[in-house]
């Protein structure tokens, strides 16, 4: 007994002594940990002077008196992880997540042999992943995510950690391939590897991790194909491989993953069909396939999955939306936007009682919106924008008692906006780009939840009522491009939450209400293109948060307010300020007068200033140079005087500077050479003098420079040749002297060069003639001499103007240099030569006149022969081939006449080639005349248009075509080769088009189906759009065709289309677009607005082109008896009626109907309907039309 007592006491004291030593060591380690921190005060409870045990300190947990857990997450601890932590021998959990630790993991940590949980996520740790992890055999949970680890995954990670059940290395900078040893982790259930730079294929050994439940590796660089062994993961519940360039199809073997609940393959560059085998995944709740290139229909087998979420946006899925969707009884979100689904929206969607989010935007859906859509009342967000939906929305959404967002933009919905929409809990209502008519219901403004209401590009009319002030929650109101009238109500000032107000392109009148200044949250105010009058209220421009102010195209008068928004006065550019509509100040096209306020120079965050086309006077304030963020400054079209401030060279971000059409004088500042970002510089039509600064050669980004119509002088600097991106250089009508620098031949991007009407001398540099991209060269009216170089553009009279240089010689100017070089030494010899020539001409003319009179007597009784004789009577008149003109950048230029008669062809050749304009050679009728086929000597076939005398507009048409076609060269425009004018006779010579007109093929050509198939029709649509887009946008001034129709689309031997017959075309100058009292166009193609206004626009051409697209897709004429029962009695009305009835497919030409081509045909129909919008402002421009057609 005594022995046992002694043994017990010995063991007790021995254990106590050991424990005391261990406890002292642990306390020391914890204190060392604290002291190593850069902010130790955050662990204030760790204090050895207190009576509390270290086991009671924050984050410390003990078992049997020893530390087994240290958990200090999200405390903002800073510093490096101290190696002393390895002294905590019994530690099983170490969690330092969500702090600010940096540096590497100390290797001593691997001495913690009992460690089961290691969480170092959310810090700034660096270095390679430590290979010594294999020294922790009991590790179950490892989280190193959200750090800065680099390098590859060491195979030892997977070989020596057999117990590991969760591994997270996501959001680091790891790279390389995944080693096949990953298959050794037989107990792993969670594997997170995303947001790294891993590459290669996922190893097939992944299938050996039999217990894996969650596998997430998004946002890496894995590629396909995916290993079929994934199907062996029978416990897999979540698979996320999104945002990887897999470039493969979805494996059919995924259908064997019966426990799969979440499948996320978003933006994985997937191709092929959605495999029907996915229907075997009976546990699948969330299927996310958006942003891929999947095609085909939705497989029926998906109907058997109890999905909560199905997203497949931005793919190429097609077919109709299946009615079996109604089987998804627990579906919460259905997102199928940006695909190619067609047909009607199935009413069975009402059978999805849990559906909250429905997005079917940007498809080819047609017909009316089914009233059953809101049958369950659960929908909270509906997006049907960008389809072909038609009909009205009366009572359609009455049952949507939970609806907070309704987006219907860019459809063909008509009728009025329902009165009862205000009863819904709507926060966003977007109705842009439809055919809504009538007034905006007053009841809508009673909505207390409405934060966004947009209805631009419709045909809404009426006025804005005072009740608008009741919509207190409204933040965004966009009603641009409608027909709203009246005054802007003062009550709009009550909308203190309003951030964006856009009423552009309406018919509002009166003054801008001062009360708008009470909308203190306004960031964007756009009242442009209305009929507003009066002065700009100071209270508006002083709005503290105003970032975009557009009041252009009104009748505003008075001076510019001197205290713009406080937002503009910020010292630094705020965040997001480079987004669209930030820092814009546009007051152009008004009647504002007085000086530009100096205070504008204090608005340091202004990005764009446009004050053009007003009546502003005085000098340009030097203070504008302080606007260091300015990218565009347009002060053109005013009455500004004085010199250009040299300080403007400080605006280093300036990309566009337009000071044209003012009265500025003095020199061009040398400091302009500092504007390294400048792309376009326009100083035309001022009174500038002096030389062009050599410093402009520093403008390496400049593409267009116009210094024309000034008094600039001196020699042209060779430094201009360093502007390597220059496309257009215009310096005509100045007083430049000296020679043209040959260094300009280094400007390989140059397309337009005009140095005409100066005092330049010397020879034409050969290098300039050989510029590879030069389309137009105007050297006319200088003092140039010598032989014209035989290279490139100088030998092309359609591209080079050389007239007015008397000492030039060579074939192209019709003067032989050798003959001209042999001087006649005797003045008597010259006089004798001239006298002899005169006698010869006199005798010839006298004889010809006698012969003609004799013939006229013989033919007096034959009208047809009299016509032939009259034509033959001027056979000595020359048929001149045109020299080209050029397009140019300034807003307005004078019409360029054709000063270079070349390659003379006798009219007799034309008369003979057409057999005296015989009826058998007629190939068509153009505007105001008949077109004949003619084969000239040399086997050149041309088309000759003989303008009719009976047409009172014949001379106008002739001049219009001359002015237009002589300046334009494009592969999709018919080239005008020559012309002749004698008395009342006028002839135009065009290139001959073998396949005639589109009109001929669509209606008269036998065997049309075999030849004019869908691919050719699409080719014709794209080519014709390309030609018309060039007329509208290829250069300034723009060109309106005014008579676009199928007979004016000609086809060459390869069915490449070319736009023809510019008989009604006219150049638009800066403010000229009115036609004569004669309505332009051809019946069936005339836009509706031409019957109400004398103003011709490019949007009128777009409408006519929309009719041509309809002809191509339907095979029908624009007018005819087939349309008697249709609205408007024409093809357009018939097509709209069919589409509104949900029968868009019936519009397609029956000869072309094909399941494979239906989507592209419906897409062309959709583009046509956009072009045919009744309101011009709703129509796209031709560049947008061309882009859309090319994407089919």
From Swiss-Prot:
GO cellular component: membrane; plasma membrane
Listed EC numbers: 2.7.11.1
Keywords associated with the record: ATP-binding, Cell membrane, Glycoprotein, Kinase, Leucine-rich repeat, Meiosis, Membrane, Nucleotide-binding, Phosphoprotein, Receptor, Repeat, Serine/threonine-protein kinase, Signal, Transferase, Transmembrane, Transmembrane helix
Originating gene: EMS1
Family according to the record: Belongs to the protein kinase superfamily. Ser/Thr protein kinase family.
Protein species of origin: Arabidopsis thaliana (Mouse-ear cress)
Active-site residues, Swiss-Prot/TrEMBL: 1043 (proton acceptor)
Enzyme class: transferase
GO terms under biological process: anther wall tapetum cell fate specification; microsporogenesis; protein autophosphorylation
Transmembrane spans: 828-848
PANTHER family per UniProt: LEUCINE-RICH REPEAT RECEPTOR-LIKE PROTEIN KINASE FAMILY PROTEIN-RELATED, OS11G0197000 PROTEIN
Miscellaneous remark of the record: Some ecotypic variation may occur: in cv. Landsberg erecta, meiocytes of a null mutant fail to undergo cytokinesis while in cv. C24, cytokinesis clearly takes place, with the mutant meiocytes degenerating shortly after the tetrad stage. In cv. C24, the gene is expressed in the young ovular primordia, but the protein is not present in these organs.
Signal peptide start and end residues: 1-18
Superkingdom of source: Eukaryota
Residues bearing the modification Phosphothreonine: 914
Protein name, entry field: Leucine-rich repeat receptor protein kinase EMS1
Processing and modification events after translation: Autophosphorylates in vitro.
UniProt domain Protein kinase: residue ranges: 917-1192
Subcellular location: Cell membrane
């Amino acid at each position: 007994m005594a022995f046992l007592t002694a043994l017990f006491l010995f063991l007790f004291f021995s254990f106590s002594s050991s424990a005391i030593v261990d406890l002292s060591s642990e306390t020391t380690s914890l204190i060392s940990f604290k002291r190593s921190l850069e902010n130790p005060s955050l662990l204030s409870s760790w204090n050895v002077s207190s009576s509390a045990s270290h086991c009671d300190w924050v984050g410390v947990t003990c078992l049997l008196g020893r530390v087994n857990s240290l958990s200090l997450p999200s405390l903002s601890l800073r510093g490096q992880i101290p190696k002393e932590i390895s002294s905590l021998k019994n530690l099983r959990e170490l969690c330092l997540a969500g702090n600010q630790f940096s540096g590497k993991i100390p290797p001593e940590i691997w001495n913690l042999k009992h460690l089961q949980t290691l969480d170092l996520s959310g810090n700034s740790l660096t270095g390679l992943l430590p290979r010594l992890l294999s020294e922790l055999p009991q590790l179950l949970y490892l989280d190193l995510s959200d750090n800065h680890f680099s390098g590859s995954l060491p195979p030892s990670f997977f070989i020596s950690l057999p117990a590991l059940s969760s591994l997270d290395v996501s959001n680091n900078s790891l790279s390389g391939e995944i080693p096949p040893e990953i298959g050794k982790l037989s107990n792993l259930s969670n594997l997170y590897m995303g947001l790294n730079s891993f590459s290669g294929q996922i190893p097939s050994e992944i299938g050996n991790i039999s217990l894996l439940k969650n596998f997430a590796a998004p946002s890496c660089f894995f590629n396909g194909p995916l290993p079929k062994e994934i199907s062996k993961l029978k416990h897999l519940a979540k698979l996320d491989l999104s945002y990887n360039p897999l470039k493969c199809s979805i494996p059919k073997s995924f259908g064997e993953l019966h426990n799969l609940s979440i499948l996320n393959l978003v933006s994985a560059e997937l191709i092929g069909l959605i495999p029907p085998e996915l229907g075997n995944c009976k546990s699948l709740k969330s299927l996310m396939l958006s942003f891929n290139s999947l095609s085909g229909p939705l497989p029926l087998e998906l109907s058997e999955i109890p999905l909560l979420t199905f997203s497949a946006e931005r793919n190429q899925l097609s077919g109709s939306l299946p009615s079996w969707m109604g089987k998804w009884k627990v579906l919460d979100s259905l997102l199928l936007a940006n695909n190619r689904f067609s047909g009607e929206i199935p009413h069975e969607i009402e059978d999805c009682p849990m559906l909250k989010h429905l997005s079917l935007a940007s498809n080819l859906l047609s017909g009316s919106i089914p009233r059953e859509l809101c049958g369950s009342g659960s929908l909270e967000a509906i997006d049907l924008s960008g389809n072909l939906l038609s009909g009205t929305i009366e009572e359609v959404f009455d049952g949507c008692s939970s609806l907070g967002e309704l987006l219907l933009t860019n459809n063909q919905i008509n009728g009025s906006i329902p009165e009862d929409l205000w009863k819904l809990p709507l926060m966003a209502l977007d109705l842009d780009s439809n055919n809504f008519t009538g007034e905006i219901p007053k009841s809508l403004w009673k909505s207390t939840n409405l934060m966004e209401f947009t209805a631009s590009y419709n045909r809404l009319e009426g006025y804005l009522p005072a009740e608008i002030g009741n919509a207190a929650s409204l933040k965004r109101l966009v009603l641009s491009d409608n027909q709203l009238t009246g005054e802007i109500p003062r009550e709009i000032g009550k909308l203190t939450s309003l951030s964006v107000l856009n009423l552009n392109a309406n018919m509002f009148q009166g003054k801008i209400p001062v009360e708008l200044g009470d909308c203190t949250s306004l960031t964007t105010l756009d009242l442009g293109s209305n009929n507003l009058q009066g002065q700009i209220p100071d209270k508006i421009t002083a709005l503290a948060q105003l970032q975009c102010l557009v009041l252009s195209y009104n009748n505003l008068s008075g001076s510019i307010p001197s205290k713009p928004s406080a937002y503009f006065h910020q010292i630094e550019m705020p965040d997001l300020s480079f987004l669209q509509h930030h820092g814009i100040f546009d007051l152009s096209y008004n009647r504002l007068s007085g000086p530009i306020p100096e205070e504008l120079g204090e608005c340091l965050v202004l990005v764009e200033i446009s004050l053009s086309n007003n009546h502003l006077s005085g000098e340009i304030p030097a203070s504008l140079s302080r606007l260091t963020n300015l990218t565009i400054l347009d002060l053109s079209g005013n009455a500004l005087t004085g010199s250009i401030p040299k300080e403007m060279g400080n605006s280093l971000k300036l990309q566009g500077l337009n000071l044209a059409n003012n009265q500025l004088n003095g020199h061009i500042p040398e400091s302009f050479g500092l504007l390294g970002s400048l792309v376009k510089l326009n100083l035309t039509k001022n009174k500038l003098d002096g030389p062009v600064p050599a410093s402009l050669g520093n403008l390496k980004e400049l593409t267009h420079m116009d210094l024309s119509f000034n008094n600039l002088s001196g020699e042209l600097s060779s430094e201009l040749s360093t502007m390597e991106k220059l496309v257009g250089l215009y310096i005509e009508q100045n007083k430049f002297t000296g020679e043209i620098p040959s260094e300009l031949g280094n400007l390989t991007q140059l397309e337009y060069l005009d140095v005409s009407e100066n005092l330049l001398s010397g020879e034409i540099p050969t290098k300039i003639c050989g510029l590879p991209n030069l389309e137009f060269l105007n050297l006319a009216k200088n003092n140039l001499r010598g032989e014209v170089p035989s290279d490139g553009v100088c030998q092309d009279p359609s591209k080079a103007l050389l007239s007015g240089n008397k000492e030039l010689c060579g074939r192209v100017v019709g003067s032989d240099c050798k003959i001209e070089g042999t001087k006649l030494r005797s003045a008597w010899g010259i006089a004798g030569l001239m006298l002899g020539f005169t006698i010869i001409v006199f005798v010839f003319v006298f004889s010809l006149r006698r012969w003609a009179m004799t013939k006229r007597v013989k033919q007096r009784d034959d009208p047809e022969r009299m016509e032939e004789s009259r034509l033959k009577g001027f056979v000595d008149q020359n048929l001149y081939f045109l020299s080209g003109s050029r397009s140019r950048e300034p807003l307005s230029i004078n019409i360029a006449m054709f000063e270079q008669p070349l390659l003379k062809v006798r009219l007799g050749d034309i008369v003979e080639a057409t057999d005296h304009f015989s009826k058998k050679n007629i190939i068509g009728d153009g505007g105001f005349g008949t077109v004949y086929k003619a084969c000239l000597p040399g086997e050149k076939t041309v088309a000759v248009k003989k303008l009719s005398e009976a047409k009172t507009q014949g001379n106008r048409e002739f001049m219009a075509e001359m002015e237009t076609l002589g300046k334009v060269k494009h592969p999709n425009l018919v080239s005008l080769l020559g012309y002749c004018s004698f008395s009342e006779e006028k002839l135009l010579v065009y290139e001959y088009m073998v396949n005639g007109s589109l009109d001929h093929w669509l209606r008269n050509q036998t065997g049309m189906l075999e030849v004019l198939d869908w691919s050719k029709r699409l080719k014709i649509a794209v080519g014709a759009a390309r030609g018309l887009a060039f007329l509208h946008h290829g250069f300034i001034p723009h060109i309106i065709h005014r008579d676009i129709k199928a007979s004016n689309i000609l086809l060459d031997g390869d069915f490449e289309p070319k736009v023809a017959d510019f008989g009604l075309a006219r150049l638009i100058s800066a403010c000229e677009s009115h036609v004569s009292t004669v309505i332009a166009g051809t019946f069936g193609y005339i836009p509706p607005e031409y019957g109400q206004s004398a103003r011709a626009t490019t949007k009128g051409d777009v409408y006519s082109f929309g009719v041509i697209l309809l002809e191509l897709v339907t095979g029908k004429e624009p007018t005819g008896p087939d349309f008697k029962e249709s609205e408007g009695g024409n093809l357009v009305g018939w097509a709209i009626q069919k589409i509104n009835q949900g029968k868009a497919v019936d519009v397609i030409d029956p000869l072309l109907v094909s399941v494979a081509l239906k989507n592209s045909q419906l897409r062309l129909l959709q583009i046509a309907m956009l072009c045919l919008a009744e309101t011009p402002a709703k129509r796209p421009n031709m560049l947008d039309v061309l882009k859309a057609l090319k994407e089919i």
